Curated annotation (Swiss-Prot):
It is an enzyme of class 2 (transferase). Pathway: Amino-sugar metabolism; 1,6-anhydro-N-acetylmuramate degradation; Cell wall biogenesis; peptidoglycan recycling. Catalyzes the specific phosphorylation of 1,6-anhydro-N-acetylmuramic acid (anhMurNAc) with the simultaneous cleavage of the 1,6-anhydro ring, generating MurNAc-6-P. Is required for the utilization of anhMurNAc either imported from the medium or derived from its own cell wall murein, and thus plays a role in cell wall recycling. The gene is anmK. Its EC number is 2.7.1.170. This is Anhydro-N-acetylmuramic acid kinase. Keywords: ATP-binding, Carbohydrate metabolism, Kinase, Nucleotide-binding, Transferase.
Amino acid sequence: MPVLEHVDSLLYLGLMSGTSADGIDAALVRFAEDTHRRCELVAGTTVAWEPQLRETLVALGQGAETVAIDALGQLDAQVGLAFAAAANQLIRDSGVERRRIRAIGSHGQTIRHRPEADPAFTWQIGDASRIAEHTGITTVADFRRRDVAAGGQGAPLMPAFHLAMLGAGDQDSAVLNLGGIGNLTLIPRDGAVLGFDTGPANALLDSWCQRHHGTPFDAEGAFAASGRVDAALLQALLADPWFALPPPKSTGREQFHLDWVLQAMGSARLDAADVQATLLELTAASVADALLRLQPSTRRVLVCGGGVRNPVLLARLAARLPGVVVESSARYGLDPDYLEAMGFAWLAAELLAGRAANLPSVTGAAGPRLLGAIYPA
């Protein structure tokens, strides 16, 4: 890639690994102005986790495994080194001079998210000191815990970024991120933005596919398309009290994992493809139900995250939302594969600019807060 022409542009690098832990997304972002209301994806890459490390992270995330303090300390360092390596790879591939990148915004890897606990907590690992040390770039991390300390859920954080990039239009709209967990940003023509997790998305689909189909994800939804939705199982899954909770709410693998699915199945003997089809329908149903309940006037849903590559899921979502345009965020210049990583670059920029970046209407926090901690180069 040629040297950037806009010497007055603000370059930030965002790093993200989500609930699915399918890889580290790295995005190099140019902000056109100090207000950070417009951005351009300069370059992006996804670096796969080392398989054994991914297995450990997934098990930790769903509470299926405990780790000794020494092992957890080493895991934190390993994740930090992996994030640094992903950043360095992107910088090399992009041809951008390292000194031109003002900061890195790193989400880290969530290993536990307990906003309902007393006291509430959320925990992301990935030693930011090592990222700063191995990249030579100031790193901003630990974005969620200040919101939790202020009484919020600490999630989702992307609605503030969605609002900054898209603004309120002339009709009610929504942004749907289909990552490991689904989450919605509701942007009304007027009034406060609302954002919340909708429930499981790729995390369950990927896990079931890995166990019963031998592939890490369901390419284009083909496995789900080969099965039929089991109405009884779908009803049992949707009966989980979490779905009826009002926002603000957030969740993770601690709540929605394969043992949860197996418990709902009980003694029923179902074809693996039928379960996959049912899990896909669960994602579509939980999103559509929430949208129709909380902003029924929505006329456009922009989709991002890995689920945008699943045409079967998008078709089922559209079928449950008649009269609503369901389309990729790419239509509006926001790359669906890297939107979350771009968002964490934006969060880093907002902290360094001294601006609060949470939305209390989304997370339930007591008020606006500066998010993140700075690790100088």
